[in-house]
Every structure is written in C-alpha cells, then in structure tokens.
A protein has these predicted regions:
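P-loop NTPase switch module centered on the Walker A-proximal segment
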Residues: 1-101, 107, 141, 150, ...
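P-loop NTPase catalytic nucleotide-binding module
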Residues: 1-16, 35, 103-200
C-alpha cells in the first residue's frame, strides 16, 4: 500500500490549550493510552525536565501516527513568545498548521504574529477555538473578531447549514458562480480551498 505522509503543526499563543489538543489528537488516533497535561508534567511530548518543572512547552517535539492511509507527523510547538524562534523553525517543514485560539481571550497580539508567519510561509491553516466553556462571549462575536482581525475567509465548520456553504462559496469566484447555479459545494472543493489558502 502506498501511504502518503502529512506533517502538521500545532501552534498557539501561550495557555491556549495547544499541548492539550496535541495530547487529545494522539489519544484519539491511538498513539497514546492516556492524555497527559503540561502542568502535571506528564504530557507525552513535553519530555524535557525543564518543561516539566516550569509547566510549559519549551522545545518543539514530534509524534508519528497512522491516520487512515496517511502517515502523520504531528509537531507540538512552544507557545510562549520567548521561544518563538523554536516555533518558527518548525514552519519550514509543515504541510498544514492548526492555530489554536483561546476562546476566552480571543485574538491576542501573539496570535496575530503567528498568523502573519503562517501566511508568510504559505501554510494552509485550520483554526481550533479552544476553551469556549470559559468564554465570556458568544461564538458568533468571537467568529466576527477572527474574521475581522485574521481573515474574512475564516469560516466556522460547526454547522453545515446554508450560511456555511454561502461563506465557503464567497472564498473563490469560480466556486461562487458554480454555487449560485447548482446550490452545491463538494467536499473536494472545500479541501482545495483549504490547501490553496483561500479558506480557513
């Protein structure tokens, strides 16, 4: 069987829940049997003693797992601004990035810096909005902030309703024309928009 390889990085402002998301991905893909936490010193990817002592990610780490017919390399990066150089080194090898945003804080200054770096390196990016259970605002107002401060083509995949398909369609003129004629958008077309950095 010919397997494809995908390199994906998890990037975020400090305390957004980035390593927790990485642990969850590894757990649900069968790579680990128990999810750890940075602050407990038992995160799978935070193996350095200094990371365990301080409760933060300092060094980029990788884990590999199989997802369907793809070999995936997951890179967990530091979120603290003091270790930005370590994070930026990983951008050169990424096929895709997951930018984690803390729902209770919204788009922070460092989030904007990360976004600009992802755009500079032309990395297709998924946004993962974390900690919405702690948010003091509605998902709609947070989405509005993200579209205003990051990109108007950031779309919530929470509901696949008519509004979702309209927001996806306006990301590309050709797709919009097709959508207005047929009222349909195929999954492959959405994948292509993401890969070509027209949809986030």
């Amino acid at each position: 069987m010919n397997k494809k390889h995908l390199c994906m990085g998890v990037i975020a402002h400090v305390d957004s829940g980035k390593t927790t998301l990485s642990e969850s991905i590894l757990y649900h893909c069968g790579k680990i049997r128990k999810m750890g936490r940075v602050d407990n010193g038992d995160a799978y990817l935070d193996t350095d003693q200094m990371e365990k002592d301080r409760g933060i990610t300092i060094f980029s780490k990788q884990a590999e797992f199989l997802l369907g017919d793809r070999d995936v390399t997951l890179l967990d990066t530091p979120g603290h601004v003091d270790f930005s150089a370590e994070m930026e080194r990983t951008l050169q090898v990424l096929d895709y990035a997951i930018l984690v945003i803390n729902g209770s804080d919204g788009v922070q200054g460092h989030t904007l810096t990360l976004w600009r770096l992802l755009k500079r390196y032309h990395i297709p990016t998924f946004l993962f909005i974390n900690k919405m259970d702690q948010a003091r605002r509605t998902p709609e107002s947070l989405m509005e902030e993200i579209q205003t401060r990051l990109d108007r083509h950031c779309v919530s995949f929470t509901k696949k309703d008519e509004l979702f398909f309209e927001e996806v369609a306006v990301c590309d003129d050709g797709l919009l024309e097709k959508y207005l004629e047929s009222n349909t958008i195929e999954k492959e077309e959405i994948k292509e928009l993401i890969a070509s950095e027209k949809l986030y």
